[in-house]
Amino acid sequence: MEYAYLTDPGKVREHNEDSVIIVKNHNNEYLLAVADGMGGHRGGEIASSIAISHIGKSFRELGKLGKKEDAILWIKNVVSEANVQIYKYTEENPESSGMGTTIVLSVLTKEYLLFGNIGDSSGYVYKDKQIHKITNDHTLVNLLLKSGEITEEEAKDHPRKNVLMKALGATTNVEMDIFDVETDVEGIFLCSDGLTNMLEDEQIAKVLNEETTAEEKMNKLIVKANNRGGTDNISVAFLKKDGELSDN
């Protein structure tokens, strides 16, 4: 397995409100996660950091995920715990009112591959030199698109593109969408919208196809997004499979 993750403030924002992680546990299982925070007074930075720290720590401490049903339950529970932590922080620090974060994650074991998301950070599988989006964005624009009120072209530059219908930490309860995916993929790729607002899927895939290391690929994606304006924080995480997962 080769993997790398990277985050960058971009060219416009003063602070980086994204957080990103890849963790391997004792059972040779992998967690990838990206969070894109929002809110004033560094609130977004705190929200995404709480989410990623809690989820990463819990995964590290977990001996193994177990069966697929157990893993789905773990994902739902750990995300719910992170949600409560962010919500409580807001209650104790009123100046951070309105803070929250997106979260997209993926877990890979020998037996299964799962994705989960809240918000508009994206999860993809990498296969046959292409990336295929697994997650669905919880945005107003995506709702309008699915209901047929706007076209895909209109969605790209819609003035309310950043309006989220769901975020971690915004309410006491939040439900994560879980996706059960076939394991016969060549890689997993997660990113915040700071990348997808700058680059098309084909441009991302082109970089992933290059004969370079995972770290070099992640660096190049960030450089490309910044060259196109870097209007937001940019976070990327990529795991390239090299055959089957072993038990050690």
Task: Describe the predicted segments one by one.
Residues 1-248:
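PP2C/PPM-type serine/threonine phosphatase catalytic domain
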